[in-house]
């Protein structure tokens, strides 16, 4: 894989990535591709900065592969439509079926990112969901259930995947558990979380909502919709409230100025501190000793002194007893 460089769609200026800033591909449990810093163990494995970098996944579209090998792997899944999921499918099967996916830091390809999709999307089917469910059914084994939780197990009609499963068996590919342990060991596993799902206030039908996926936004209260997405949260075994790589972060300090303290989302850092929480008798308590409270207008979410008699500080959150079953 090359480094994908951005070409400005107005000026055609090329923005080049410094070799020290190269990232590798990953994915979240919505089965969406994302970028990650190169892990320390991978940096240590390489002898010089121009050496290839192993990557768990790729963005797709820009890569080189031997044609015969590509066909042996089954090419792209013919049951997938238009766009979405195909890059993760080829990433997983390359690694799980004996290959290796690497980024070559000295290879650069410029790309103009479209502002809108040029495709005509069918109105009667969620194409991306169909594609990613096919991907999950064939390659994720029991880990597919973490994705299905977020879909409320509404898989839709994803077609027949028997031929793709037969291909995997014929190629004698590794399990997805092997992939996570050997290729992407830094990936957060939802089954290790203590709580999961929506965080619903006991006084009002309001849930804690990320207000979009942009880092640095304040958590808000929003009518519970039961669709996951912005309202799907997990508490890790380390006490982080997170969705994939985004964690609740509370720095404090505003209350001393007579202002209300908000909670923001930032990249998870696994260091505790601002990102460490616990659930105590329905209250969500921060390391600082303050608790999460829904404001009287049902929209604001603030940190306040803990009061077990204040129902706006009481939340319902599903406790995970076991990993989801197939």
Residue ranges and their predicted role:
Residues 28, 34, 71, 177, ...:
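Compositionally biased, low-structure terminal segments
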Residues 186-326:
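Lectin-like carbohydrate-binding module/patch detector with strong preference for beta-trefoil
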Residues 12, 81, 91, 119, ...:
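A generic signature of intrinsically disordered, low-complexity regions enriched in glycine/proline
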């Amino acid at each position: 894989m090359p480094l994908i460089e951005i070409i400005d769609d107005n000026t055609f200026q090329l923005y080049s990535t410094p070799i020290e800033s190269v990232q590798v591909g990953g994915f979240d449990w919505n089965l969406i591709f994302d970028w990650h810093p190169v892990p320390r163990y991978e940096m240590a494995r390489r002898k010089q900065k121009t050496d290839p970098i192993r990557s768990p996944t790729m963005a797709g579209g820009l890569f080189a592969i031997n044609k015969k090998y590509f066909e042996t792997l089954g090419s792209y899944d013919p049951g997938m439509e238009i766009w979405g999921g195909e890059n993760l499918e080829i990433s997983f099967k390359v690694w799980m079926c004996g290959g290796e996916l690497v980024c070559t830091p000295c290879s650069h390809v410029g790309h103009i990112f479209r502002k809108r999709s040029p495709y005509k999307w069918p109105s009667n089917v969620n194409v991306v969901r169909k594609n990613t469910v096919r991907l999950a059914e064939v390659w994720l084994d029991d880990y597919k259930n973490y994705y299905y939780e977020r879909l409320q197990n509404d898989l839709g009609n994803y077609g027949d995947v028997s031929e793709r499963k037969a291909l995997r068996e014929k190629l004698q590919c590794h399990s997805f558990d092997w992939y996570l342990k050997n290729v992407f060991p830094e990936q957060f596993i939802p089954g290790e979380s203590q709580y999961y799902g929506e965080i619903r206030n006991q006084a009002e039908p309001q849930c804690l909502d990320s207000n979009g996926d942009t880092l640095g936004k304040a958590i808000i209260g929003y009518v519970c919709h039961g669709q996951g997405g912005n309202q799907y949260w997990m508490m890790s075994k380390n006490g982080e409230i997170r969705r994939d790589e985004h964690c609740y972060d509370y720095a404090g300090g505003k209350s001393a100025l007579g202002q209300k303290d908000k909670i923001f989302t930032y990249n998870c850092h696994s260091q505790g501190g601002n990102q460490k929480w616990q659930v105590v008798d329905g209250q969500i308590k921060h390391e600082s000793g303050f608790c999460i409270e829904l404001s009287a207008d049902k929209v604001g979410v603030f940190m306040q002194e803990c009061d077990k008699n204040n129902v706006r500080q009481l939340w319902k959150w599903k406790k995970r007893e076991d990993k989801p079953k197939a």
